[in-house]
Amino acid sequence: MAGLRLGPLLRHVDWESGTSATVWVETDRACTAEVRCPGGAGGSAPTFCVVGHHYALVVVTGLAPGSATTYEVLLDGERVWPLADSSQPPSTIRTPPVPASGAVVAFGSCRWAAPAVGESDPVGPDVLDTLSARLAADPEAERPDVLLFLGDQVYADETSADTRAWIARHRRAAGTGSAAPPDQVADYEEYTHLYDESWGDPELRWLLSTVPSCMIFDDHDVIDDWNTSAAWVADMRATPWWHERITSGLMSYWVYQHLGNLSPAELAEDTVYAAVLAAGDGTEVLRAFAERADADPATVRWSYRRDFGRTRLLMVDTRAARVLEEQHRTMLDAEEAAWLRTQAFDDPGGVDHLLVGTSLPWLLPPMVHFAEGWHAALCRGERGPRWARFGEWLRRRADLEHWAAFTSSFERLTETIAEVGRADAAPATVCVLSGDVHHAYVAEPVWTAGQQPRSRVFQFTCSPLHNSVPTAIRAGFRFGWSRLANSIGHLLARHGRVARPVIRWERSGGPWFGNQLMTLTLRGRTARLRLEMASAGAKQGRRGTDRTGARLIGVIDRSLTDGS
């Protein structure tokens, strides 16, 4: 009898017709996976195989718009979900009414796997586990229409003690991986263990089975500072274990994260997916694809678009699509940048809210922005070869690789946002959603006279979901918003011969530190922002608590538009 190894994950829900969804599962052997709903809705798919693991992405059809439909998962006709001993409510697929009146979008990034039940948690309660417990306690309460995961869903280079022990046993048994770091994953099998550890968490597993999700990678999904510079790439390609690491990282990302980002129509047109399904064993097909994606990133698009009624999400790849030639560095290659502009301007008048998902923040604390521009200038050779060598050394130690470090890309993104916001049929809001920096804040551009867009424009940064930041770094981020820090930043920019940014911006909220989640409630042309943080110490069993007694506390609840 086939067993359910991981999942189910509810991924894509159709907002155009409100009648279909996709559900992802991993099984322990080849079988037919079926999703069955009351009333006849459902779907089935045979599993496909990658490196001895079996997966299916089931397209569920026959759903009713504006409904909440429970479902179960069967493998070769035997029910495997809900789990026999589960105390969680049934998993449901919620479809929007058509036309949809709005969307509730929750987002964050950077999640270490939560420890097992009964173990202490050195970084505090997991905000997603805590959200899961609140929703399970009151299944009729408002829930997100979608969860956006903005990078570092797994940490391939910062593994837990349990995972390090498992890696050691795996490598001894397999006789492989001796050259790879003992505290980092080396191959596809080790990546599967990371996903088991992260998504097998009972609270998160139920949450992902009942709330749709969209995902994009950041560096730790592969390795810290992934694609930070051309010199870094050259050094890594000369490292004996790197080829298998990057190939396995991209293969596993495609299977565990990317496939579920696609609509059924996009899946039907995806040639790689078709080839994997057609092969008895899709390993070599997917390996060739991953090797090609690493060698020539322009051959693959990881970015994607989702429309939630009149809310548009553009999820942007800011890692694999970079141009790293030092004199012509860009965050996005020409084709990717053109795609972003095309999608942002498509169907003017048909979008009330434009969301740009980018793992790396667009607007940083001003001192950090100036420091990254200064540093990029040093690496280009503005102050000579000695400073350039220092710049490369610093780049690998200080994570100086956000939009600010790619000046032309920063300017082009700013221009795109401003043009969208100034259009006659501009959306009510343009919101850049980011993570990465292990704290949360809100920043708003300060436009010059006569350049004020019709749209309200925001940078919302929310991180981590479950991680930590050292005290010294907290102090640094707080200082980074100060006037003194701004003055220091200007001095650095002058040393690097860096021009002033094309806009100014100010912090209008934060910084906040903790395991946290931001939620946008978008109704018509109104918008509200809520930030909630997981707090320990509540009594066990209290409504809205998780297995450790944590609860979500409100940090801000703020209107972003008139009338909300």
Residue spans for each PLM region:
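Metal-dependent phosphoester/phosphodiester hydrolase catalytic core
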Residues: 1-564
